[in-house]
């Protein structure tokens, strides 16, 4: 199972290469945890190979949003000459928008041939975030519901979604994972899970409290 396809075609090509090198005759099951382009940008590589992409039905973007993402990326290039030449085109080489073509929902299970992976609702970072839990191994792929060391991005949603996000963290903790593969950052080992979840909770709680104070 490949969880998220990276930002672009070339990233997805590398991910596929690693997966293929482990066991070349394995079929690929590909899932997206969310709709942000750093998670779905490489979908085009897999769809070109006729490999299905599974995700929440809300994981859909428009061509205009994809073009805006490319422009935003280009605008972050510090060098004005490189920026004026649209150097981001190199980053997005061969990359086209491909939305997931197979819908999944919390409660679904993937049978990977001896390992079952459960689909877990983990909204908050976006309203449609999913996580994936291989219970027999105790490994949870959290997407951006959890990031280690990084600060989570809160700007895609509002305070009501942050409160839902806290519930998602509780749901994940109740699964008692042995390891968490976050959306960004290092793999979180058993001994670090409680600390990382508490760090995420504090960031979200502080943001909620600050917003409530501003609204008084």
Language-model segments: what does each one mean?
Residues 9-10, 35-41, 60-64, 126-129, ...:
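Active-site environment of divalent metal-dependent phosphoester hydrolases
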Residues 6-7, 153-157, 191-195:
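Short, solvent-exposed loop/turn segments at secondary-structure boundaries
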Residues 49-52, 133, 139, 161-215:
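Divalent-metal (often Zn2+) His-rich catalytic cores of metallo-beta-lactamase-fold enzymes
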Residues 1-23, 131-144:
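Conserved beta-strand hairpin/beta-sheet module of binuclear metal-dependent hydrolase folds
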Residues 10-13, 17-105, 109, 202-209:
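Active-site HxH/HxHxD metal-binding segment of metal-dependent hydrolases
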Residues 103-134, 139:
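Core dinuclear metal-dependent hydrolase active-site scaffold
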Residues 65, 71-72, 150-160:
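Acidic/histidine-rich helix-loop elements
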Residues 3-6, 27-36, 54-57, 121-123, ...:
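Active-site neighborhood of phospho(di)ester-bond hydrolases with catalytic His/Asp-centered motifs
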